[in-house]
Amino acid sequence: MTKPPQALHGITRGLHHVAIAVQSLAAARAIYETALGMQALPIEFVPSQKVNVLVLFSDAQRIELVEPAAPDSPVTNFLAKRGPGIHHLAWRVEDCAKAIAALKKAGLKLIDDAPKPGSHGTKVAFVHPKSTGGVLMELVEDPHA
């Protein structure tokens, strides 16, 4: 494994959540609430990604279920190619715009050049999986974290 560029040091503040792409929030929700005892926040539509999002949490664990809300949602394409499963890892950052600039300076390819509104008042941006060993990553500025 290669050593990350020094520009990345200190950008993230830990894992924010793991996102899982699902065909149906209702079906997946039952598994996480019943079998795992997780609690859910209200479902929210995220226009920039054309998805419905259900955040589930338990202690320090946080999972985000993402369901496509339109045929042209990036998650629709993901599900068609890969089926349900882990969609992305999300990293908590203090300032999404500064994190984007630092990652660009370090040579990483970003999908988003500026923060976009995420669920529950967050600002988000995605890092292209070609820059991260095949893993889609999200930067999350969360005023509630």
Enumerate the language-model features and the residues they cover:
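Vicinal oxygen chelate
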Residues: 2-11, 54-55, 91, 100-145
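Conserved active-site tyrosine of GNAT-family acetyltransferases
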Residues: 28-33, 103
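Mid-chain, well-packed structural core segment of small domains
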Residues: 78, 82-106
